[in-house]
Every structure is written in structure tokens, then in C-alpha cells.
Amino acid sequence: MPCVQAQYGSSPQGASPASQSYSYHSSGEYSSDFLTPEFVKFSMDLTNTEITATTSLPSFSTFMDNYSTGYDVKPPCLYQMPLSGQQSSIKVEDIQMHNYQQHSHLPPQSEEMMPHSGSVYYKPSSPPTPSTPGFQVQHSPMWDDPGSLHNFHQNYVATTHMIEQRKTPVSRLSLFSFKQSRPGTPVSSCQMRFDGPLHVPMNPEPAGSHHVVDGQTFAVPNPIRKPASMGFPGLQIGHASQLLDTQVPSPPSRGSPSNEGLCAVCGDNAACQHYGVRTCEGCKGFFKRTVQKNAKYVCLANKNCPVDKRRRNRCQYCRFQKCLAVGMVKEVVRTDSLKGRRGRLPSKPKSPQDPSPPSPPVSLISALVRAHVDSNPAMTSLDYSRFQANPDYQMSGDDTQHIQQFYDLLTGSMEIIRGWAEKIPGFADLPKADQDLLFESAFLELFVLRLAYRSNPVEGKLIFCNGVVLHRLQCVRGFGEWIDSIVEFSSNLQNMNIDISAFSCIAALAMVTERHGLKEPKRVEELQNKIVNCLKDHVTFNNGGLNRPNYLSKLLGKLPELRTLCTQGLQRIFYLKLEDLVPPPAIIDKLFLDTLPF
């Protein structure tokens, strides 16, 4: 049976001791004639890594692929392998594979006479593709019969069955790669290239395994089919530091949850924003139904019930208040004929007489609501330290203490209301003199209006701007009869069920109005008209105003009542000045003198 054998021959004279020569023969034995110097071409020094072939070199696919029972007679191919420094080699681990077995029954003398680098024996499995064009061969998978690697003596002549009985794994081999030659390249210019040592684990790799070589990822399919029977570009293999067993990281699991936001009301998962705030679908629907139905809820506890994912349905009042506290805007909820149509225009209007809803200035009313919310004390931070509902409290203490408390409550509210006024859109654009005039003229009106809206007249509980909570009886000796008028106004105001948006517009109109002595009354009038139109649109289309006739007139009718209450407040301050028990603060004295109507 023809076979190919590689012999580690003796180096010719003048050759480097590290030089190695391999000869291929087809007769089944080795001839020393091919190892004579005339067949050897020494064209490189010890640092050169090229190998010159004197005859035609088969393609690498042919060299590695076709192993069967015969091999055609080929011209001898002589390889000169000079090594410099340390030998470039492949380290084969002591791991057995299915076709690589260790045999330890070689003669001792043969093992001693073997060279350090070893020799290579390839068992052919099929005829290779000759270099002559037009020669047809049968192709077969590359790794069906990979053969074995063996070491043997330089003069050892072996047949196929002898080699299979006396084979041991090679410890070190030379690493090489073939490169495709250009068309018309002379036969003598075929080259093999050494790329340095490489550590190759011999354990079997599964099909489709991925490896990384020089930063490039490639896969080893199973089985590997032989490409076209011609040369192909050489595969550049990196140094030993880049191992072939590096695995590509697995892709991230598709079942990992996405990082969605949380509902600002209850803490449940929220995918997007609804009515200006990131909320879940449950809180969005609850807020929408509450606004559309204009529902009024009552808290059975202390109006501070916990609102979370598990307990959000226990108290509707506290849940709706938290929706407003986190910034959900009621004006965005549609309550007209387009409700539930997701922005699609109706095919036919219900009746041609129904007025089409204009686009309300959402930015203005939203800014007014935000300014009101920011200037009000939080319900969870109220100060009940001085609250007493004892009717005998008004008889305790002296008058100076109650008068001083009255002045303190006024001055404490002044800075808070001024901060609220500066957040009204367009107010800061007015002249500074007009701003001061409008604020000082409307301070007592705003003090009464805001106090009446947040207080609880049924229980006689008064909540001031700084968060202090007092009973009505605790304010009688300081406020006089004025406190009774405030409580009565508060009761009438809350009976109207004014929502926070409408109240914010009313509070702005109480200050932005015509006053005597304005430098630019035209600009004040323009701002006033914007707020009135905003309130009108809100009441008409978003607050059930179509079913509540004269509701807008009733809201605007509260402004003259505030003027009357403001006059009562000035009279109370004037009376306290006449008593002269406690001197008023300078800011209150200036306010009194600047706003006297007489």
C-alpha cells in the first residue's frame, strides 16, 4: 500500500545544526539520495522563517484532507526548516483523542536515537489533488480519518501496519501555515511560514465551537467540508498567550425584565407618563374616572392613609389627593364628546348646536396650580402643637399675647404669598412698582381666601400658611369679629365644591385686577383677561359647567366678598393701633397706611 513518510534526515555539511529536512516519497521507504546537498537549498540564515520548496507544493487542503488507502507518486518535495533561538513548535497536550493513542512499545534504542524535534508521519486516505491542472480527484470530508502522528528513527522503514503498532504522540511539532501563491508564481517560490509557538489542547471540541485568534472569532463546523482544490490564504495564528479555548460570551437572556419606571402614586410598574406624571394604568384610570365624573370622596381616617400597590384601593380620597400632590393635571383629562376616542375626530357631531371646545391654555392653568400647591403647607407637616378646642381658652392669658399671635400670623403669611405671586406667569414682567401695588392691595384678600379654602369650618379648624393649626376660639381675642366672617366665608366657599384649578384662577384674579395708581394698567388688564379666559374654558368644558348654570358668575362673585372682608381686616388693624397694647410690625403698619380706602 503506498504511503507517505517523513524522515528526519541528517543535516548536510555547512548546514545549521537546527536545520531539518523532510522528504516525501511514494515507494513506502526512504532514500538517502534525497538528502544530499544538491537537493538542499540553503538560502536563509537562522533568523529566516521561510521554507523554499524545490518542486511543486500541493495545496494545504490536499495536504491535510485526503487520507485514504493510496497516494500517487509525486516528485520529491524537499523542505528546509531552519530554526533560530528556540524551536517554533506546537505543544500537544497529553490528552488522548479517539484517533490519537499512545504506544510505549517502541524499542529503547529507537527512542534514544529519535531527534528532539521529532518526525511527522501522515497516513494518506485519498489521492491528493496534483498541481497539474485538469487532474480530477474525489473529495471527502477532511476529518473523517485524521490519521496519527508518530515518532520514529531517521533510517526506520515502516509500512502502514507497522506504524500503527509502533506509534507514540509527538511532543513538539513545527507550526506552519500555507499561503496562496499568485498565478504564474514559480514552483520554487512556494513558502511555508512559522508563526511562533502555539499551545494547542488536544481535547475534542464540540461542533460549532467558537475560538478567538488574534481578536478574530471563528467557528469550527462539524463536519468540515473540503473547499476548492487549490491554494487558499494562509491562516495567521497568534502567540501562545492567546489560547484557542477562549469562549465567546453568551448573549444576554431575553427574559430579563426591562428597567421600567415606577408609579409616582402607588409604586407599581409604570411604562409611560399619564396626565403629566409617570403612573401605572390603574392610577391613570382612577384619576381619569374621578375627574370625568367630578367625584367627591370622603376619608374615614385622618386623611393620611397609605397609598401603595397593595392598599391603593382602600381610601379613594387619599389616593386622589396623592395624584394631585405628585402633579397630575386634571385639565388634561378630556370630558367632552371626544372622550375615549384617543384623539380621533368623530364622524358626525352629536348636535350642531354644541359648542366645539377650544384648546385651553394648559400651560397657564398648570402653572397656576403648581404655584398654589407649592405655597401651601403639606397635610403631613401641619403643626398641631398649639391647637386647643377648649371653649375656656379664650378667657386664659392676656390680650397682648393674642394680639401678638395675630400679627405673627399675618407677617408669616406675607412672605409665602409673595413667593406665590412671583410664580404667576406674566406677573414678573410687570413693572416693579405695579407688582408691589398689586400685592399690597390684595394681601388681606389673599390671606382670607387661602385660609378659607384650606380650613375646616365645620370643626372650627383653621390652617394658616405656615402650617399652624388653631381652633376658631383661639383666634377670637386676636382677630375679633373678623374671624367669624372668615369662617362663614369659608363655609360658603367649600359648599361650592371648587376644584384646585378653578381656585387657583380665582386667587390670581384677586390680585391681578385694576388698582388705583398703576403705571401700566393696560398690561395688567391683558394678564387679567388671560386668566379670566382660562377660568372660563376650564369651568365650561372640564368641570361640568354645562350642567351647572351660572357657576362661573358665582365664582367671580366671590371677589367682591373678598373686598368686604379686606375692609374688615383693615378696621381690625386700625382698632388694635388705637388700643396700642402691642405696636404693629413695620410691614403691617406700612401695609395699613398704603391700603387705607379713606
Swiss-Prot record:
Sequence segments annotated as region (Disordered): 1-22, 337-361
Motif interval(s): Nuclear localization signal (NLS1): 338-350
One annotated GO biological process: dopamine metabolic process
Single GO term (MF): sequence-specific DNA binding
Primary localisation category: cytoplasm
InterPro entries: NHR-like_dom_sf (IPR035500), NR4A1-3 (IPR003070), NR4A2 (IPR003073), Nucl_hrmn_rcpt_lig-bd (IPR000536), Nuclear_hrmn_rcpt (IPR001723), Znf_hrmn_rcpt (IPR001628), Znf_NHR/GATA (IPR013088)
Keyword annotations: Cytoplasm, DNA-binding, Metal-binding, Nucleus, Receptor, Transcription, Transcription regulation, Zinc, Zinc-finger
Subcellular localization: Cytoplasm; Nucleus
Zn-finger (NR C4-type) residues: 263-283, 299-323
Compositional bias segments (type: Low complexity): 8-22
Residues in the DNA-binding region annotation: 260-335
One of the Pfam families matching this protein, by short name: zf-C4
Domain NR LBD: start-end pairs: 360-595
SUBUNIT field: Interacts with SFPQ, NCOR2, SIN3A and HADC1. The interaction with NCOR2 increases in the absence of PITX3. Interacts with PER2.
Recorded domain comment: The ligand-binding domain (LBD) contains no cavity as a result of the tight packing of side chains from several bulky hydrophobic residues in the region normally occupied by ligands. NR4A2 lacks a 'classical' binding site for coactivators.
Biological function: Transcriptional regulator which is important for the differentiation and maintenance of meso-diencephalic dopaminergic (mdDA) neurons during development. It is crucial for expression of a set of genes such as SLC6A3, SLC18A2, TH and DRD2 which are essential for development of mdDA neurons. May confer liver-specific regulation of delayed-early genes induced later in the G1 phase of regeneration along with NR4A1.
Family, as annotated: Belongs to the nuclear hormone receptor family. NR4 subfamily.
Record protein name field: Nuclear receptor subfamily 4 group A member 2
Highest classification ranks of the organism: Eukaryota, Metazoa, Chordata, Craniata, Vertebrata
